Amino acid sequence: MIKLNEYETSLSERLLISLHNLCATSGEMARRSDDLAQIVQTDVNTVNQCMDKHVSDGYVVSYFDNEGNRRFYLTSRGIIRVCSLFS
């Protein structure tokens, strides 16, 4: 079983887990990239690069809000991916 702490999971996985823990599973609950960067303690560009891969894999949806902030939320496929980390 994977232990879910910062030393045993990749940044990519921590971002998915963070979205899940924040209940970011719809557009209304989407989280800004700068918020995620603060949570995982990295810079916004790194978050955006990781999240671009998750978008292409179908795990995450990305959009820009009215203020120009990039936001992300998990798709159903992303939720399944996060749950698979726990088994």
What are these regions (language model features)?
Residues 55-65:
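A short, conserved structural fragment
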Residues 1-18:
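Short alpha-helical segments that sit at the start of domains
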Residues 41-56:
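Short amphipathic alpha-helical interaction segments
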Residues 25-38:
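Short acidic, hydrophobic short linear motifs in intrinsically disordered regions
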